[in-house]
Amino acid sequence: MIKLGIVMDPISSINIKKDTSFAMLLEAQRRSWELHYMEMSDLYLHQGEARARTRLLQVENHPQQWYQFDREQDLALETLDVILMRKDPPFDTEYIYATYILERAEEKGTLIVNKPQSLRDCNEKLFTAWFPELTPDTLVTRNAAHLREFHQKHGDVIFKPLDGMGGASIFRLKKDDPNVGVIIETLTEHGNRFCMAQNFLPAIKEGDKRVLIVDGEPVPYCLARIPAQGETRGNLAAGGRGEARPLSESDWAIARAVAPTLQEKGLIFVGLDIIGDKLTEINVTSPTCAREIEAAFPDISITGMLMNAIEERLEK
C-alpha cells in the first residue's frame, strides 16, 4: 500500500467543490492509499532528519463532513512513499524552510511533488523568462524610469508584484493614466522591490486559461477564467467565472514547448496561465482548477493522471 503525505492549508476551511488538493486525496483514497495529513507547523527537522506530526485521514465528497482524522503519529518523513506539497503561497521564507525539510526526506527516497529545489528555483512569475518566445513583452525591474518607458512604449500595460496570487495587486495602466507614478511607487516600494510589467493582452476578454500539465503530459481541457464586467483580471479569486474548454492549437503548442523542462525539473503537477497565444505564468506551488475541469468533462480524471504518474515514478 502506498503511503501518501500531504502538506496543505487547514482542511477544515477548504471549499471542496473547487479544492484540487481535496480531489487528489479522494483519488488516492479510491486507490486504497494510506493518507497522512500535515500542515506547515507539523514539519520539523532533528539532527538532519525530516520528521512530522501526521494524522491519518479519511475524506468524503460530502458538503458538511468531508474529512475525518484518525490516529496521530510522529514519524520520519522518509517512511512515506510520496508527499504532496500543496501549501498555497505566499512563497515566503517559511515556505522555503519547509522545502528544505522536505528535501531531506527526498534525499532518503521519498518522492516529493513538486520537487523542493524546483519549487525554490521556479518563481511563478519569473520562470516564464526561460521561455521568452512564448510570452508577452515582459520587463522585471525596480527602476521607475524603466517602468515609465515601458508604459510609454506600449500605452496599455499590466504591472504586477512577483509574489502575489489570486490576482492581488495587479494594475492595468492605459495611455496617459494619471496614477502611473503612485502605482510604480506602491509596487516597487519606492524602488526597493522588483515588479513585473507586461503589455496588455486584449485576448483576456476570452479568458485567462489555466492549462494543467501532469508529469510532462498536457491535460486536453483547460479552465478559461473570464473577467467580471469592468475587470481586467480573470482570476476566480477576483470575481472571474470559470469556463472549461478543450485546448486550442496554440495552447497545445505552448504546453508541449514547456512540458519537457517541467518534467526534467521534477515539476509533476503544474498550471500554465495562457492569455490568447501568450504564456503569462507557470504555477508550480499548488495549482488548482482540476475540480472545475473534471466537473465539465467527466471523461478526464486529472487526479487519476497524477496518481498514475506517481505510481510510475515510485516503480522506477
From Swiss-Prot:
Cofactor(s) in the UniProt record: Mg(2+); Mn(2+)
E.C. number(s) listed in UniProt: 6.3.2.3
Binding site for ATP: 151-207
Cofactor note: Binds 1 Mg(2+) or Mn(2+) ion per subunit.
Catalytic EC class: ligase
Disulphide-bonded residues: none
Substrates-to-products reaction catalysed: gamma-L-glutamyl-L-cysteine + glycine + ATP = glutathione + ADP + phosphate + H(+)
One Pfam family linked to the record: GSH-S_ATP
This protein's name: Glutathione synthetase
The organism of origin for this protein: Photorhabdus laumondii subsp. laumondii (strain DSM 15139 / CIP 105565 / TT01) (Photorhabdus luminescens subsp. laumondii)
Gene (name only): gshB
